[in-house]
Swiss-Prot record:
Protein name: Glycerol-3-phosphate acyltransferase
Cellular component aspect of the GO annotation: plasma membrane
Gene: plsY
Classification lineage: Bacteria, Pseudomonadati, Pseudomonadota, Gammaproteobacteria, Thiotrichales
Subunit structure: Probably interacts with PlsX.
Keyword Cell inner membrane belongs to the record: yes
Molecular function terms from GO: acyl-phosphate glycerol-3-phosphate acyltransferase activity
Organism annotation: Francisella philomiragia subsp. philomiragia (strain ATCC 25017 / CCUG 19701 / FSC 153 / O#319-036)
Recorded metabolic or biological pathway in which this protein acts: Lipid metabolism; phospholipid metabolism
Amino acid sequence: MNFLNFSMLVFAYLLGSINSAIIVCYIFRLPSPRSVGSGNPGTTNVLRIGGNVPAIITLAFDILKGLVPVVLAKVLTGNEFITACTALYAILGHIFPIFFGFKGGKGVATLIGTLFGFSWILGLIFVVTWLCVAVITRYSSLSALVATVIASFSVIFTSDLQVATPFLIIAIIILVKHKGNIQRLISGQESKIGDKAKAKNDSN
């Protein structure tokens, strides 16, 4: 691996480590997303805590954290596998941020950015899948999980297995991070889109 490729991976991880949910809640003087609602510092929890504006800002920045390094890797390296690995490192930064004690979000919004950066078709597959499941079920977590699996596996059909492997690893990590959501979906206790945040120990 040359210096450029290594630099792209480091840049992706460090950018991914900037947790916008925590920063946005601090700027808007909202409770920390790590102590309210689901306890997850991500877009959905910010939406429950502070409403549309903070959530949109959080979502936009988290998407950019995935989009920017992947586009740069694509342009600068011209290597699909390195670009896919850059996507993986951006996700790892978001989920295990060095700046926040390695305790971050669940990676879905950043995944959207990496998918659009890698191929707009993959990004579109994710968004359409998410919207369809969300409209039918009103479960943000279920929508994210289904969209993550479908979009990540779709890389196999747009590239080869080696290039798809980092995205398949991303899908596995995101599924594991949503273990609690999956358990609550099964038990019927998962919050739906539009539900207000509660104290962490009373919430999903």
